[in-house]
Amino acid sequence: MSKTVVRKNESLDDALRRFKRTVSKSGTLQEYRKREFYEKPSVKRKLKSEAARKRKNKKRF
């Protein structure tokens, strides 16, 4: 869980920007979206192989 304390004389926009940065760096939102719905193991394997294929093609060019 990301925690951000608003500093003295800091605007709310700046604090929100810092919070968003910490959340994105920790990968919390990405993990939530990944686990939002159940994926069958066969679907996980298929997505994993497709991602590997995309990385391989990207590396080749």
UniProtKB/Swiss-Prot annotation:
Which GO molecular function entries does the Swiss-Prot or TrEMBL record give? structural constituent of ribosome
Offer one example of a GO biological process linked to this entry. Answer: translation
> Signal sequence span per UniProt?
none
Q: Name one Pfam family in it.
A: Ribosomal_S21
Tell me a GO cellular component. ribosome
Highest taxon in the source lineage:
Bacteria
| UniProt keyword terms in alphabetical order | Ribonucleoprotein, Ribosomal protein
Name the family: Belongs to the bacterial ribosomal protein bS21 family.
Name this polypeptide is given: Small ribosomal subunit protein bS21
Organism (species)? Pediococcus pentosaceus (strain ATCC 25745 / CCUG 21536 / LMG 10740 / 183-1w)
Task: Report the gene name.
Answer: rpsU
